[in-house]
A protein has these predicted regions:
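Non-catalytic DNA-recognition/assembly elements of restriction-modification systems
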Residues: 1-30, 55, 152-160, 164-167, ...
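Histidine kinase transmitter module recognition
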Residues: 113, 125, 176-179, 183
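A specific heptad-register position in long alpha-helical coiled-coils used by two-component signaling proteins
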Residues: 171-174
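Basic, amphipathic alpha-helical recognition segments used for DNA target recognition
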Residues: 18-25, 54-60, 76-80, 96-102, ...
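DNA target-recognition patches
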Residues: 17, 21-24, 34-69
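A generic structural signal for residues embedded in beta-strands
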Residues: 85-86
Length: 193
């Protein structure tokens, strides 16, 4: 989709957009039956939950499922590099899978199929949409969005060099924030001492 966007000084800028559904494959996870011990005992496949998405790269997990649990449930094995996006309860948390793993149904797995989009760019773009997704999330007891809504999210298409530049800037900002947070924590400890 192409839209016109008013730019500075009255010039019109042409901006091209795509949707997640057009440029990515999107799947939701699943939970093997808890009543079947053979789906969980001696498992060797990492199973990711919302609480495991704590940073950009996700490689920590609390539970493992078995091959039998994977094959007899709606769980799907996601490859390293898959973007994880929470769609139930805690909406809009984003991470990039740093291992091969499965997720529960509260997490969508997004694999980019369009060479015009980089993983890091989509990660930061989705991260910037957290307030938006929390506003559109609807639920009786807990907020949620469905996969159709996620697939309809529009992504601005800019050239890959600009995407890489944006990512580089945002990564520098994140590093600076981490350093400042550590300094604040260190000062808090000093005050308490």
């Amino acid at each position: 989709m192409i839209t016109l966007k008013r730019a500075k000084f009255g010039f019109v800028e042409i901006m091209e957009y795509t949707s997640i559904g057009e440029s990515c494959s999107v799947v939701s996870g699943g939970t093997p039956s808890r009543s079947k011990n053979e789906y969980w005992e001696n498992g060797n496949i990492p199973w990711i939950k919302i609480g495991n998405i704590k940073s950009k790269y996700v490689n920590e997990y609390d539970e493992l499922i078995t091959e039998q649990g994977l094959n007899n449930s709606s769980a799907k094995l996601l490859k390293k590099g898959t973007i994880l996006y929470t769609i139930f309860a805690t909406l809009g948390e984003v991470g990039i899978l740093d291992i091969e793993a499965c997720t529960n149904q509260a997490i969508a797995g997004i694999n980019i199929t369009d060479s015009r989009i980089t993983t890091d760019y989509l990660y930061y773009y989705l991260k910037s949409k957290k307030d938006y997704v929390n506003n559109i999330g609807r639920g009786v007891a807990q907020n949620n969005i469905n996969l159709t809504t996620l697939k309809n999210f529009e992504i601005p298409l800019i050239n890959v060099d600009k995407q890489l530049n944006i990512v580089e800037i945002l990564e520098k900002v994140e590093r600076m924030i981490c350093l400042k947070e550590k300094e604040i924590d260190d000062l808090d400890l000093l005050i308490k001492a």
